[in-house]
């Protein structure tokens, strides 16, 4: 049996473009994609922290070090420039793989540069 686990995420990136008439997708700064381990054309989940909307699309590579996070096509109705988003991917793992798995977590600054990276989320305390 396979378990679906968080593979990677970019946490609190800022939407820089919302392009309704661009071919659907989400363009992500190539440096952020590489650090997170997101592949071009990979399915991504986008969770809009600002308005609570969630949607699924695919990633395309944006210019390296540009800071671009562009929500394109119909998904542009789900995000506005300046919104905070979390971009995540998931993977299916065998039990042995799941036991050893650590997600790749990239935390963004407000200009979409990298604040820090991690491979675990701290325990939430009451």
Curated annotation (Swiss-Prot):
One of its GO terms (biological process) is pantothenate biosynthetic process. Its cofactor is pyruvate. Pathway: Cofactor biosynthesis; (R)-pantothenate biosynthesis; beta-alanine from L-aspartate: step 1/1. It holds the Pfam family Asp_decarbox. Substrate binds at residues 57, 73-75. CDD domains: Asp_decarbox. It catalyses: L-aspartate + H(+) = beta-alanine + CO2. InterPro entries: Asp_de-COase-like_dom_sf (IPR009010), Asp_decarbox (IPR003190). Its EC number is 4.1.1.11. The modification Pyruvic acid (Ser) is found at residue 25. Heterooctamer of four alpha and four beta subunits. HAMAP family: PanD. This is Aspartate 1-decarboxylase. It comes from Acinetobacter baumannii (strain ATCC 17978 / DSM 105126 / CIP 53.77 / LMG 1025 / NCDC KC755 / 5377).
């Amino acid at each position: 049996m396979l378990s679906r686990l968080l593979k990677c995420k970019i946490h609190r990136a800022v939407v820089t473009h919302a392009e309704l008439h661009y071919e659907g997708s989400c363009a992500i700064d190539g440096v952020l994609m590489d650090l997170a381990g997101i592949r071009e054309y990979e399915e991504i989940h986008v969770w809009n922290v600002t308005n609570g909307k969630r949607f699924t699309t695919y990633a395309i590579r944006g210019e390296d070090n540009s800071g671009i996070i562009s929500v394109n096509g119909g998904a542009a109705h789900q995000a506005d420039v300046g919104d905070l988003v979390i971009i995540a991917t998931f993977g299916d793992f065998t039990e042995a793989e799941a036991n050893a798995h650590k997600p790749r977590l990239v935390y963004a600054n407000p200009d979409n540069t990298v604040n820090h990276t991690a491979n675990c989320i701290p325990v939430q305390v009451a």
